[in-house]
Amino acid sequence: MANPFVRNQSFKSVFFKNLVGITLWVPVLMFVEQHVVSVGTIEGRSMKPAFNPETNMLQRDRVLLWKWNKDYKRGDVVILRSPENPEELLVKRVLGVEYDIMKTRPPKKLSLVPVPEGHVWVEGDEQFHSIDSNKFGPVSTGLITAKVIAILFPFSRAGRIDHEGFRKNAVFLSGKRSVK
């Protein structure tokens, strides 16, 4: 006797039903990847030792990128479009926020640079191998595409990003509105 609860469905109808179900999720997943969270690879050595501490550069850090929040604080590591070449993505640490006055570092002449509203001051952790705000000045927050929130790989270094490991003496004078 046949089981009345088992429907006799053809392979074709099951396939198309599953295909429609999967297809409905594609736009959702694309939105999440483009606007909320994604995985990226850190290239180069400008953020050593926080990222890519190995000298051979064969093993690059894989990181979790958060794209939703646009509130940047000192110590955040961000992905941004280069002000000099918008096709190029940079990884830098936010050292100054709007209304701060930043002291540039050598070899640039000692000078004080105010960070205007809607901008941040970014630098690489490895100061001798970094092209950053010391070269191109404060960066519009509109150029920032994501915040790095965790290292995923290598597993030996996996975990949340240290936001306290930045040059605390970078800020010469904090602006009133930026102090929290």
UniProtKB/Swiss-Prot annotation:
One of its GO terms (molecular function) is serine-type endopeptidase activity. Its EC number is 3.4.21.-. It is found in: Mitochondrion inner membrane. The keyword Mitochondrion applies. Pfam families: Peptidase_S26. The active site is at S46, K92. InterPro entries: IMP2 (IPR037730), LexA/Signal_pep-like_sf (IPR036286), Pept_S26A_signal_pept_1 (IPR000223), Peptidase_S26 (IPR019533). Keywords: Hydrolase, Membrane, Mitochondrion, Mitochondrion inner membrane, Protease, Transmembrane, Transmembrane helix. The chain crosses the membrane at residues 19-39. It is a single-pass membrane protein. One of its GO terms (biological process) is protein processing involved in protein targeting to mitochondrion. CDD domains: S26_SPase_I (cd06530). Catalyzes the removal of transit peptides required for the targeting of proteins from the mitochondrial matrix, across the inner membrane, into the inter-membrane space. Heterodimer of 2 subunits, imp1 and imp2. Belongs to the peptidase S26 family. IMP2 subfamily. This is Mitochondrial inner membrane protease subunit 2.
